[in-house]
């Protein structure tokens, strides 16, 4: 079952707001009149107490509304659940995603009301997964509309241009089950965006050639090239599925060693 926090938060704001407004318009005046009659002549009257439901609604509504507006239009926190973007993003990284970088979208409906920047080569994009839009994915933008993408012998080609890779060395990559895999770490220069990638020669990489990215679509891949479910397998990301651009790591928890990765805190995502 997928946990749709955005929808739950929306209903929480709506219900608490309706209760608080109904009380303000119809119940508060009568309650104060009854209180005034009951405490008339008292030198030290007790504090006027609200019904518990109304008290909770009035207390939580402004907080819920503020959180809803911040995460809908400014920044939203996400947790990285898999290693598909390693070594750039580690499992257990908590990141902030800029929600307005690619335009303002209505919460819940996700309709664009104010277009802004379009995704560029090398951007790390959070989006609603096309096969199941209730699930959020995060990948790197490899192809923008009109690009011709090829992937041959684990090397990228964009519009016929080979994307240069330089060797960093051999390292171990741990998967979600804790198993270690020996991988090659390389530095990829992707149109000026330099970032490390993992290549696992023990895993088969299916080649493809001259895949053209359609209008209003994007081709995305993980930096952990042989351990990423991405556009190579399920297709393109439509513009309307975009959630935002990953910006910073604000927390990182190593679930295997049970500790905070202090060195990753505040790291810029690129």
What are these regions (language model features)?
Residues 63, 67, 72, 84, ...:
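Small-side-chain structural scaffolding
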Residues 76-85, 126:
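Membrane-bilayer interface helices and TM-boundary transition segments
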Residues 2-30, 38, 45-53, 87-270:
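Soluble "head" domains of membrane/secretory-pathway proteins
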Residues 28-36, 76, 80:
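Transmembrane helix-loop junctions in multipass membrane proteins, especially transporters and channels
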Residues 47-79, 100:
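Transmembrane alpha-helices and immediately adjacent membrane-cytoplasm interface residues
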């Amino acid at each position: 079952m997928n946990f749709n926090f955005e929808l739950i938060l929306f209903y929480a704001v709506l219900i608490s707001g309706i209760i608080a407004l109904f009380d303000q318009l119809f119940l508060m005046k009568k309650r104060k009149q009854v209180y005034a009659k009951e405490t008339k002549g008292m030198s030290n009257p007790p504090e006027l107490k609200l019904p518990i439901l109304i008290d909770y609604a009035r207390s939580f509504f402004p907080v819920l509304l503020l959180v809803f507006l911040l995460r809908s239009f400014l920044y939203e926190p996400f947790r990285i659940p898999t290693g598909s973007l390693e070594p750039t993003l580690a499992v257990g990284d908590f990141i902030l995603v800029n929600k307005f970088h690619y335009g303002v979208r209505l919460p819940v409906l996700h309709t664009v009301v104010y277009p802004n920047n379009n995704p560029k080569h090398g951007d790390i994009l959070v989006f609603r997964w096309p096969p199941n839009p209730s699930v959020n994915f995060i990948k790197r933008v490899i192809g923008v509309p009109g690009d011709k993408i090829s992937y041959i012998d684990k090397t990228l080609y964009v519009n016929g241009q080979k994307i240069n890779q330089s060797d960093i060395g051999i390292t171990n990559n741990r998967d979600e089950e804790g198993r270690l895999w020996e991988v090659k770490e390389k530095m990829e220069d992707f149109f000026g965006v330099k970032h490390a990638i993992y290549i696992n020669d023990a895993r088969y990489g299916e080649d493809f050639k001259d895949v053209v990215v359609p209008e209003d679509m994007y081709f995305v891949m993980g930096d952990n090239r042989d351990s990423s479910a991405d556009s190579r397998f399920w297709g393109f990301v439509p513009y309307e599925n975009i959630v935002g651009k990953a910006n910073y790591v604000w927390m990182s928890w190593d679930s295997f060693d049970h500790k905070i990765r202090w060195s990753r805190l505040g790291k810029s995502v690129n």
